[in-house]
A protein has these predicted regions:
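Sequence/structural signature of beta-propeller modules
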Residues: 11-42, 237-239, 346-347
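Surface-exposed loop and turn segments in beta-propeller and other repeat-based domains
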Residues: 30, 34-44, 85-96, 135-141, ...
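Beta-strand-rich domains and repeat architectures in extracellular enzymes and scaffolds
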Residues: 38-70, 272-286
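Repeated scaffold domains used in trafficking and secretory/extracellular systems
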Residues: 47-53, 95-103, 141-153, 203-205, ...
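Short coil/turn segments that connect the beta-strands within blades of beta-propeller domains
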Residues: 57-59, 106-108, 152-154, 211-213, ...
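Beta-propeller blade signature
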Residues: 74-77, 167-172, 293-307, 346
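Asp-box/WD-like beta-propeller blade repeats and closely related beta-sheet repeat scaffolds
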Residues: 115-155, 159, 186
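Loop/turn-rich, solvent-exposed surfaces of beta-rich toroidal or solenoidal domains
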Residues: 261-302
Length: 347
């Protein structure tokens, strides 16, 4: 998704670089150094461009960025260099889909969004672990550019280049559509079109609480993290935190364009949730100082669902993704290096 957004928005522009400054708000809570234990090397699996993952027992359900059939492939962690357990990973007669927003609300299925078509594709997890792909498709409302989506049994929440609100709430019961809440502001550009704000905060991570009654949405290109509830009336914002604002150059004529400066501080790389907690991988780095290291995180922020920061965790290895194994009650990550190692975090 990050590479795609560079093309859409014009890339990163040069500017005088700042030295890296830590967020003072993160220093007000307890911080611990934790160990990341490497478990398996995924570099030999043939899967590249990971869009997200979940872990169940000794199986890793991985969402690649490009797929011809379904949204995920399964890796046996006991034999990670062996055959990927997916009978339809390559179907020569079908075009490749470009996927984003890999998600799993209840652990029983995984979804990803084909943002070129607005189709939310769902695979049941149990068949995937046996090498079988069973796919269903939900077409999100046409006429909009959808970018990120997550679903429960009753509704889909998505973000996109929307002119009527930050979030789209799409009912799977009656097909109704509601746009909810405003976009976060950008102090350097206080007056922007809504769709331009949609571009500014397009690269996001969205995770639903397991009961489907709340969600968290965080920006990858700034320190914005939004805590929300879902009710019969729509979406209610509980708290909006802004650890850093985007440092950008924006033009709206003739067409909206967003360019990120090299000193822009990157935000949230991934999020894992439990019924009680939110675990967010936070970068806080800049391209000017860290180059490609800005796209991995060495810090984990723990929030409650009211948006209160509880504590932070630091680790030596840079992570690009994170997931929570509900059965084990443990957090796992995938490293951002060439080995793409699966690690267990000992919090």
């Amino acid at each position: 998704m990050k590479g795609i957004l560079y093309v859409l928005f014009g890339g990163i522009v040069s500017a005088a670089s700042d030295r890296y400054l830590d967020d003072e708000s993160l220093n007000t809570v307890k911080s611990e150094q934790v160990e990341a234990i490497r478990l398996a090397d995924l570099s030999q699996t043939g899967i590249y461009g990971i869009n997200g993952f979940i872990k169940q027992g000794n199986r890793l359900i991985v969402g690649p960025t490009y797929m011809q059939e379904g949204v995920a492939q399964t890796i046996d962690l006991d034999h990670p260099a062996g055959k990927v357990l997916s009978s339809k990973a390559v179907v020569s007669s079908k075009p490749f889909r470009t996927l984003s927003a890999f998600n799993s609300w209840d652990g029983k299925s995984v979804t990803a969004l084909d943002f070129k078509t607005g189709e939310l594709i769902e695979n049941a997890v149990s068949p995937l672990t046996r090498g079988i792909t069973e796919t269903s498709v939900i077409q999100l409302p046409r006429g909009e550019q959808h970018l990120i989506a997550a679903k429960t049994n009753d509704f889909v929440i998505s973000t996109g280049f929307y002119g009527e609100g930050r979030y789209l709430l799409y009912s799977l019961v009656d097909g109704s559509v509601r746009y909810c809440l405003s976009y976060p502001d950008c102090p350097d550009y206080p007056v922007l079109q809504e769709k331009t704000k949609g571009m500014l905060y397009a690269s996001s991570i969205l995770r639903l609480r397991p009961d489907g009654q709340a969600f968290v949405c965080a920006d990858m290109y700034s320190g914005m993290i939004d805590f929300c509830r879902v009710s019969p009336e729509g979406i209610e914002r509980v708290k909006l935190e802004q650890l850093s604002y985007p440092r950008v150059e924006i033009s709206e004529t003739p067409e909206p364009q967003v360019l990120y400066r090299k000193e822009n501080r990157f935000g949230f790389m991934d999020i894992a949730v439990t019924p009680e907690r939110i675990y967010a991988l936070y970068s806080g780095k800049t391209y000017a100082r860290d180059r490609q290291g800005a796209f991995v995180s060495n810090r984990l922020l723990e929030y409650d669902w009211e948006g209160n920061l509880m504590q932070t965790f630091n680790f030596d290895v840079g992570l690009r993704g994170i997931t929570y194994d509900e059965d084990e009650g443990l957090l796992y990550g995938i490293t951002g290096d060439s080995k793409m190692s699966v690690v267990k975090l000992k919090l």
